[in-house]
A protein has these predicted regions:
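Short Pro-Cys-Gly-centered "Cys-loop" motif that presents a nucleophilic cysteine in a tight turn
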Residues: 1-58, 66-309
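Conserved N-terminal diphosphate/IPP-binding helix and adjacent helical/loop segment
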Residues: 63
Length: 309
C-alpha cells in the first residue's frame, strides 16, 4: 500500500505520536525516558519548534507542538533516529524501534488543539500510572513544569495555555487549568492499559480532523520546498563552520573519513542544526551514516576538545 501523503505546514498545531514496534516497552526505565526527553529538547531547539505539551509512556509518546519553519519531517526524523540508534546500541539489538515513521494530526489553534493538550497531559492518569493528585510529580510529562516556570527551559506550556485555552500563565491560570483537567476526567473515567489507551485513541481520532485541515492552514509551498529550505540552512551553517576552522570542502575531500577535522566539523554542525547523518557524510565524505555516527560518538566520548580541530 502506498504511504499516505504527509501534510506539512508552518501554521497551526501538530499532535504527534508514535508507538514502539510491537508495543515493546522501550521507555520502561527512567533512563530511557530521560534519553528521549533530552533528544526531544535538543530537536526543539535546533528546529525552532514550540513544544506546548509532551508525555512519555512506557511504549509510546505524545507531543503537541507548532513548527514555524514547517520542518516537522526533519525534526521527527532526527528525534526518532537519535533515540533509536542509542537504544539499539545500548541493548545490542537490531531492527525497527518504532512501528512507523510517526503519526501527526494537524489542526488550527482552537478547541480541538486545546483538547489534545488535555489528552496528552492526562495520559499517565488514564493509564493508571498516577492519580490526578500525583500528576504534578510525574516527571515524564510537561504538566510537571506547569507551576514551575523557571524549570521549563524551551518548553512552551505557558504559551500553550494562552494560545489554545485562553488561560493566563499565572498561579490563578494554573489552578484554572487543573480544574479543567479534573473536569475532563470526570466525564471519562475509564481505566485502560497503556496499549489500550493508545489503540483507543487511534481508533477514535480517525477522521476527526478532516474538517480542521482547511485551506487557511496550508502554505503556498510544497513539502519538498520546506525541506529544501531547512537543508539550505544546513549548507550555510556548514560553510560558516568550515570558514571558522580555516579549511575548505575541497581540502577535506582527500582526507580519510575518520579525519579529526572532518569529525570535529560534523559535530559542530550538528550542534547548530538537525542535519541528517546521511547529509553530513555526503558533504564531508565520511563513509556511511552509521560510521559517521560512531566517529562522532567516539570523538565526544574521548573528552577531546572540539574547538580548533
Amino acid at each position: 500500500m502506498a504511504r499516505r501523503r504527509r501534510f506539512l505546514s508552518n501554521q497551526g498545531v501538530y499532535h504527534v505520536y508514535n508507538r514502539a514496534e510491537q508495543g515493546a516497552a522501550i521507555f520502561a526505565s527512567d533512563g530511557a525516558k530521560r534519553l528521549f526527553v533530552e533528544a526531544l529538547f535538543r530537536v526543539v531547539e535546533l528546529c525552532g519548534w514550540e513544544l506546548f505539551a509532551f508525555a512519555v509512556m512506557s511504549n509510546h509518546f505524545h507531543l503537541l507542538l507548532s513548527t514555524p519553519r514547517g520542518n516537522l519531517d526533519v525534526g521527527m526524523h532526527v528525534l526518532q533516529s537519535d533515540f533509536a540508534n542509542k537504544h539499539k546500541a545500548f541493548r545490542g539489538s537490531i531492527g525497527h524501534v518504532f512501528q512507523s515513521r510517526y503519526r501527526a494530526d494537524h489542526c488550527a489553534s482552537g478547541p480541538l488543539a486545546a483538547a489534545r493538550m488535555d489528552y496528552v497531559h492526562l495520559n499517565p492518569v488514564r493509564a493508571g500510572l498516577v492519580s490526578m493528585q500525583q500528576l504534578c510529580q510525574y516527571p515524564w510529562t510537561s504538566y510537571q513544569s506547569l507551576r514551575h516556570p523557571g524549570s521549563r527551559g524551551r518548553l512552551a506550556i505557558g504559551a500553550g495555555l494562552e494560545l489554545l485555552h485562553g488561560i493566563c500563565d499565572t498561579p490563578a491560570g494554573w489552578d484554572a487549568y487543573e480544574l479543567r483537567l479534573r473536569s475532563v476526567l470526570t466525564t471519562d473515567q475509564r481505566s485502560l492499559t497503556e496499549t489500550e489507551l493508545f489503540e483507543s485513541f487511534v481508533a477514535r481520532r480517525r477522521g476527526a480532523l478532516s474538517e480542521a485541515k482547511g485551506a487557511d492552514l496550508r502554505v503556498n509551498r510544497s513539502r519538498a520546498e520546506l525541506v529544501a529550505d531547512e537543508m539550505a540552512r544546513w549548507e550555510e551553517i556548514l560553510t560558516e563552520v568550515l570558514k571558522a576552522e580555516g579549511v575548505t570542502r575541497e581540502a577535506l575531500v582527500g582526507r580519510p573519513p575518520s579525519d579529526a577535522v572532518k569529525v570535529g566539523v560534523a559535530i559542530k554542525v550538528r550542534q547548530r542544526c538537525p542535519a541528517y547523518s546521511s547529509w553530513l557524510t555526503e558533504r564531508l565524505r565520511m563513509g556511511s551514516p552509521d560510521y559517521a555516527r560512531q566517529l562522532m560518538a567516539r570523538f565526544k566520548g574521548s573528552g577531546r576538545s572540539i574547538g580548533g580541530v
